[in-house]
């Protein structure tokens, strides 16, 4: 990907996101996280040079590899994938800006225990399965507030920053919107 194409594509995405944001509220702040799952280091560097600063990976090993390959760039790295318990220590050592996929109280307790042992803190979002889809991880909406409170009370090494939810996988806009009510 060349810089001109990257810049044009990024500008188009920013324009669409900004338009959607303004239709909802001019007071909301939106950050675009470029998911680099299928991108090589050259493409990520090109997008960085075009203005994209935050990138997300869905596998701990891929996050580590890309962070190492691109360490000269001050990229804001996010973890967006399902976190397996056997990968927690590796993720903690990478210290991503934000973990988007804290999908259960059990995972939060295990993550907190390992953070405490390393004397570290980590920012995270509670993942809510608002579409009630079996293929998606996350807590169900009706227990989300209670689990959020439990994590706040019992996991001092996790800095909860909010929730993350993915709408229904559908072409039906009404069904997608229902996922976020």
Question: Model-predicted segments: where are they?
Answer:
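Conserved alpha/beta-domain cores
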Residues: 1-181
